[in-house]
Amino acid sequence: MGSFDEVSHDTGYEDYITFLKRRIRQLELQVRTLEADKERLERELSRLRTEMSRLRQPPAFAGTVIEVLDDDRAIVQNYNGPRFVVRIAPWIERDKLKPGSRVALDQRTMAIVELLPTEKDPSVLGFEVIEKPRVTYQDIGGLERQLAELREAVELPLKHPELFEKVGIEPPKGVLLYGPPGCGKTLMAKAVANHVNATFIRVVGSELVRKFIGEGARLVHELFEMAKEKAPTIIFIDEIDAIGAKRMDETTGGEREVNRTLMQLLAEMDGFDPRGNVKVIAATNRPDILDPALLRPGRFDRLIEVPLPDFRGRLEILKVHTRKMNLRNVDLSIIADITEGASGADLKAIATEAGMFAIRDRRTYVTQEDFLKAVDKVLGAEKRLAQAIAMHEVMYG
């Protein structure tokens, strides 16, 4: 009996020891967890104290560097204020401090304490296209030669500049796309932007025309400055005839401001390095009214005509716009043959209208008859509109 009590007593003692060891491990784990939480909270407290300290700092003045002196000093000018000779803080990188740089000045000592980014008009920042266009070269039909010339002038210098170095020639600075409306000029620029890993800046010529003197020219200058900072860059100026029309001797105040904007554009295109990673593409429907200075070599070196598509081009465009459509017994060559004089935009509208006719008839496929009715609706409406305009001009002059 005694031996049994001793065994029971020993077993209970061992179980109690095991329980205590397990409890110790649990407490040690809790301690490590609490220590980790403490370190995290201390880091958060330190960050918040630093943030509070920064928020309590007095505001700094913004100024412009006029001249950098040798002995860690510089001449700066506060906006619309006097000039000061001030100290340069030791953490400022001297090689980045140049005349014209925007800097932050300490409120008490006026010392330069920070380099500020270049000032830009908010509208210039809005010109940048953040998301790449989804248009590819396969989405453009009937313009193989024009696309090849555009890629040689824009894509090749950006991707393989060493080829031009080896041959010993300068790549084109700019490309002008001209031709009737709806023939794919903007589409070509989008396709290039999609295939080149570059910043794409799109601006319409009329957006550069401003009310007050010098604003348009300043906008053009800031546009090219942003392009250099974000290089490689493609600048696409649509409807360039809004600022690039021929200059006349007799001009009004508004026309003079447009001329100033044009002259700034000419100066910017002359100024940047042709082997630099900034390329300019422009598009217009009216090449006949453009200023000759804009078209001379060294500015827009390559002029690419984008004409109305011929039979083969119309057939290729129709294939592009119908490749996702459910067609039944449709001969696209017949549609291409009867749409002579139609632009790429007209052909896209015809494909869309043919699909609409099928939807009206509660069908999930498109037939030849749908396309014939669409041709009559799209091109017939254009002819009727042209006749109405001609009759109006005859009646009212």
UniProtKB/Swiss-Prot annotation:
Keywords (A to Z) from UniProt: ATP-binding, Chaperone, Coiled coil, Cytoplasm, Nucleotide-binding, Proteasome
One annotated GO biological process: protein unfolding
Source organism per UniProt: Thermococcus gammatolerans (strain DSM 15229 / JCM 11827 / EJ3)
Coiled coil: 12-58
Compartments (UniProt record): Cytoplasm
GO cellular component: cytoplasm; proteasome-activating nucleotidase complex
Gene expressing this chain: pan
Annotated ATP binding sites: G182, C183, G184, K185, T186, L187, H321
HAMAP family registered for this protein in UniProt: PAN (MF_00553)
Alphabetized CDD domains for the sequence: RecA-like_PAN_like
Docks into pockets in the proteasome alpha-ring to cause gate opening, as annotated region: 395-397
Domain notes: Consists of three main regions, an N-terminal coiled-coil domain that may assist in substrate recognition, an interdomain involved in PAN hexamerization, and a C-terminal ATPase domain of the AAA type.
Lineage: Archaea, Methanobacteriati, Methanobacteriota, Thermococci, Thermococcales
Any Pfam family: AAA
Protein name (record): Proteasome-activating nucleotidase
One term of GO molecular function: ATP binding
InterPro entries: 26S_Proteasome_ATPase, AAA+_ATPase, AAA_lid_3, ATPase_AAA_core, ATPase_AAA_CS, NA-bd_OB-fold, Nucleotidase_PAN, P-loop_NTPase
Role, per record: ATPase which is responsible for recognizing, binding, unfolding and translocation of substrate proteins into the archaeal 20S proteasome core particle. Is essential for opening the gate of the 20S proteasome via an interaction with its C-terminus, thereby allowing substrate entry and access to the site of proteolysis. Thus, the C-termini of the proteasomal ATPase function like a 'key in a lock' to induce gate opening and therefore regulate proteolysis.
UniProt record similarity statement: Belongs to the AAA ATPase family.
